[in-house]
């Protein structure tokens, strides 16, 4: 009996030792950041390197020396500028002859870089090379993938580079961006739970209004128009037309009443209730999933917004999806689910899809 008990004890010890060994063998240190905050009239960066939290105080004097260490390539003044940046709710742009749009990258940073380089938006050093063209990012940087921070900082930096070249980067908000800022972690990658543990900061607070990226994201719109093309993450429902919600008001309501906020069940604002719900611009899928949706309804929406085309993400397909002779175009081609993806291209009045090989197909 004693021999049997001793044998079982030895087996148990060996099993535990094996489990510990396997955990050590498969343990992978994480790297993330920086998360830059405005604290007591100065900037403070938090970085995680090999699962060790490091903190840096940033000033105009030391920034040239530490920017490489904190993995930033933007200018010091760019970090500070977000705190004086005012939201542009109108978001109307005219006379643009080159546009590239993509959506729903969800932290798949390498695939995002591959498709931007293949289609002439960035060079091999990841810098802007699209001249006076406009890049539209249609939302959902957050969730699923494990390189959300890298994606956001690249968009942040690219935005500044584009401005200097006479171009423009438009970062629109998606439902997962709003979820992340609101503290909804249902789709968050496990890596960021470890980030929370190491920083001792809730993930949504890493993007609070006192952080550079959080403040920057809170200045971003939900809808924009470029010439006769309307861009929005999910879509525009007929309910928004019936409520007569123009682009400017939608962006203003999201900025002031919805983004990063939990909508109370007893909310009395019917506009906020509509915009934050399934028929709002971040969540709507009716173009592709509502069997009653028709071209006539699409025309009513386009007429109200004085547009001829609506470009959306959110609903995933294998390729760019076209409805009603290019009146509605869905451009979420699965990058967020690790597919190669596609981009939407507008060049001098002609629409194309662009692949990761750089091939263009006329839509």
Q: Where do the model's predicted regions map?
A:
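Feature recognizes metal-dependent phosphohydrolase scaffolds
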Residues: 18-363
């Amino acid at each position: 009996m004693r021999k049997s008990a001793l044998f079982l004890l030895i087996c148990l010890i060996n099993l535990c030792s094996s489990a510990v060994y396997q955990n050590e063998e498969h343990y992978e240190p994480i790297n993330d950041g920086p998360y830059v905050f405005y604290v007591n009239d100065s900037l403070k960066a938090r970085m995680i390197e090999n699962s060790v939290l490091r903190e840096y105080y940033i000033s105009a004097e030391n920034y040239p020396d530490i920017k490489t260490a904190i993995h930033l390539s933007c200018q010091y003044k760019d970090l500070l500028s977000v705190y004086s940046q005012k939201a542009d709710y109108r978001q109307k742009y005219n006379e643009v002859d080159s546009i590239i749009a993509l959506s729903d990258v969800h932290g798949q940073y390498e695939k995002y870089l591959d498709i931007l380089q293949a289609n002439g938006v960035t060079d091999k050093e990841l810098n802007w090379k699209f001249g006076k063209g406009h890049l539209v990012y249609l939302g959902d940087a957050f969730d699923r993938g494990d390189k959300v921070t890298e994606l956001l900082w690249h968009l942040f930096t690219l935005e500044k580079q584009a401005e200097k070249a006479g171009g423009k980067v438009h970062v629109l908000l998606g439902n997962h961006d709003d979820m992340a800022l609101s503290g909804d972690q249902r789709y968050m990658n496990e890596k960021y739970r470890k980030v929370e543990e190491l920083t001792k900061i809730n993930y949504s607070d890493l993007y609070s209004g006192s952080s550079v990226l959080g403040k920057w994201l809170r200045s971003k719109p939900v809808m924009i128009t470029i010439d006769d093309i309307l861009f929005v993450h999910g879509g525009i429902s007929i309910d928004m037309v019936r409520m007569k919600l123009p682009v400017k008001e939608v962006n203003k309501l999201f900025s002031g009443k919805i983004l990063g906020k939990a909508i109370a069940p007893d909310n009395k604002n019917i506009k906020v209730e509509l915009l934050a719900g399934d028929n709002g611009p971040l969540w709507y899928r009716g173009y592709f999933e509502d069997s009653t949706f028709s071209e006539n309804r699409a025309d009513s929406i386009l007429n109200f917004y004085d547009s001829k085309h609506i470009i959306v993400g959110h609903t995933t397909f294998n390729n760019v999806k076209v409805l009603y002779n290019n009146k509605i175009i869905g451009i979420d081609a699965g990058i967020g689910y690790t597919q190669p993806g596609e981009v939407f291209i507008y060049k001098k009045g002609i629409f194309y899809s662009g692949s990761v090989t750089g091939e263009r197909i006329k839509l």
